[in-house]
């Protein structure tokens, strides 16, 4: 087996809307930090060996300057371990290094949730693992509906305890199928009467957004319109209470 290696195509925790195509995937990332130009949500896209793509979305507790610093540290660790082939193994390595660095710093415990996935452009397999992160949504183009991904997958966030092991699952993506990863800022927004959107409400909003857009779907339009829907649910102007990042993937081959 050839050595596995990855090259970062894009990573950041700043306000952005970017699109990339790789390994038979179309990807779109839209990020809106709370209270500034940079926040605690880190998204990253890698091109790897053997027609493989890897994505990572990390959500550092808090927002603003402090969370932004933690996100930069997670980004640094990603570079150190980006060539680990196994998805769950990548999380375990990140967690051990992040937790040990926590022990060397003063101040409150820094925790970070993470979801990472690796897509094989040849087989269509998408392997994924969670570190206490909100479950991604899978859009089945043939069935025209969203499903939650990763039932039964658990795991502590990065920074809680060393030696944590993570489990991974796999799903095959067909032409037109999509993966939607997001930070918890998207599901924890509240309406003007204080009702939280919730994961179920966000899934429904994503389906409503897709049904209202013209076909063939432009992925950037979906991300932008879904974010606008989250903002409309809030029903108020001003800064978000938490950072929001949406990372969408669609199989094109």
PLM regions and their residue ranges:
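Short, glycine/charged-enriched secondary-structure capping and boundary segments
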Residues: 70-72, 194-197
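Generic non-transmembrane alpha-helical segments
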Residues: 77, 205-209, 225, 229
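Cytochrome P450 core scaffold surrounding the K-helix E-X-X-R motif
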Residues: 138-141, 190-196
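Short, charged, surface-exposed loops that flank catalytic or proteolytic processing sites
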Residues: 85-91, 211-223
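Conserved catalytic-loop aspartate of Hanks-type protein kinases
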Residues: 184
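Divalent-cation-assisted or electrostatically stabilized phosphate/pyrophosphate-binding catalytic cores
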Residues: 196-211, 216
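… and, occasionally, acidic/histidine-rich disordered N-termini of signaling adaptors
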Residues: 1-180, 228, 232-253
